[in-house]
Amino acid sequence: MSAKETIEKLQNARIITALVTPFKENGQINFGAFPKLIEDLLANHTEGLILAGTTAESPTLTHDEELAIFAAVNKIVDGRIPLIAGVGTNDTRDSVEFVKEVAELGYIDAGLAVTPYYNKPSQEGIYQHFKAIATASDLPIILYNIPGRVVTEIQVETILRLAELENVIAIKECTNTDNLAYLIEKLPKDFLVYTGEDGLAFHTKALGGQGVISVASHILGQEFFEMFAEIDQGSIQKAAAIQRKILPKINALFSVTSPAPIKTVLNAKGYEVGGLRLPLVACTTEESKIILEKIGN
């Protein structure tokens, strides 16, 4: 699929869920938990899926496990919504080889590539890293700027430079409204700007961005859908009221390191997503109680 075709497909994907990875008690992937979870997400307005991203605990997944997840989810989704695969690491060579492998699958619509973590590259190093990934195959690439987890930030000037590459089509921006507003204003109109911060979904859409790549949409997809619909109709005050209503729930989902809270909630709702792989740990009994009280029914 060409960059242009993927952009067209993503035009209808405003609410993209960063999918959790279900685990069994022995720590192996629980593939049997995917069908119900995914079907319910689609029924509640998930319009795209991120596979093997941060919420999926990608640092503790092997590439073989990631490929198995891609295949399993693709079989369930069957072309109904776009699939975006996490393809980036802090090793450029490894990322290049993996994006080539993912591109050959034929059913992944785009790759999500995170800023290199731990290495602390310069802006030129960041640019060259993403350029190597974007030019390694014909798989369109979405930049992932999340300095809160990786320390290093892709500066807005570097993002504008990367946007000139034909195969770089979008960004998951996890910084602030100032950067979001600047990027939405300065980037090409067909370049898709998503926030990766659930609490900024309203701001991003109201500023003219594409939407949200979300953790909270596992349980708040309907609310995001209604909020975006109000914005599209020019009813900013009604949209803002929805934002204010869901914000305490969003905050609860990030009260301890994600994805522990969302897994707590999903398990409570019967989705059998299990625990987390070390070094991440599940919420404590007290943390779970507080989170579930704030989420409600």
Curated annotation (Swiss-Prot):
* S-S bonds: none
Residues annotated as site: Part of a proton relay during catalysis: 54, 118
**Keyword Cytoplasm in record:** yes
Positions of the catalytic residues: 144, 172
Any matching Pfam family: DHDPS
**What is this protein's function?**
Catalyzes the condensation of (S)-aspartate-beta-semialdehyde [(S)-ASA] and pyruvate to 4-hydroxy-tetrahydrodipicolinate (HTPA).
What is its pathway?
Amino-acid biosynthesis; L-lysine biosynthesis via DAP pathway; (S)-tetrahydrodipicolinate from L-aspartate: step 3/4
InterPro entries named among the record's database cross-references: Aldolase_TIM, DapA, DapA-like, Schiff_base-form_aldolases_AS
Query: So what does this thing catalyse?
Result: L-aspartate 4-semialdehyde + pyruvate = (2S,4S)-4-hydroxy-2,3,4,5-tetrahydrodipicolinate + H2O + H(+)
Answer whether the UniProt record assigns the keyword Amino-acid biosynthesis to this protein.
Answer: yes
Q: Name one GO molecular function term.
A: 4-hydroxy-tetrahydrodipicolinate synthase activity
Q: Where does pyruvate bind?
A: 55, 213
Give the similarity note: Belongs to the DapA family.
Looking up SMART domains in the UniProt record yields: DHDPS
Q: What NCBIfam families does the annotation carry?
A: dapA
Q: Identify the coding gene.
A: dapA
UniProt protein name: 4-hydroxy-tetrahydrodipicolinate synthase
The subcellular location is: Cytoplasm
